[in-house]
Amino acid sequence: GSYWVVEHAYPSGLLGWLSIVLKRHCEVLHELTKDEWVEFGEISFNVMKALKKTLNPKKEYLSCFAETRGFEHIHFHVIPKTAAFDENLPGTHSFRYLQVSEKNAIDIAKIRELCTALKQEMSGKWR
């Protein structure tokens, strides 16, 4: 998009954990422009549909905190509740998936494969 970029979190213990990141620096939601919000809606819609087709999650979480030191920049987490999702990590507990070492993270080749599939699903859907 013009305002946002989608990337896979790494290291991550959950395949499909995506971030929708604002391209310009901003730390608070109330400073986003209407155009940025409109595009965010379009991108998040397309991301959810693409995740459904590729990973078939039963549900998705969408969150934005932007408060952890070094991560104050506006970004949204898209967390798919796939068959691999640990039901003992509901809600904000799911952030434990980001507390893994690279050694225990999802294999980068699997992430690249998923990102290629997601890109195919979403191609041509941006304004």
Task: Kindly label every feature range from the protein language model.
Residues 1-127:
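HIT superfamily nucleotide-processing domains
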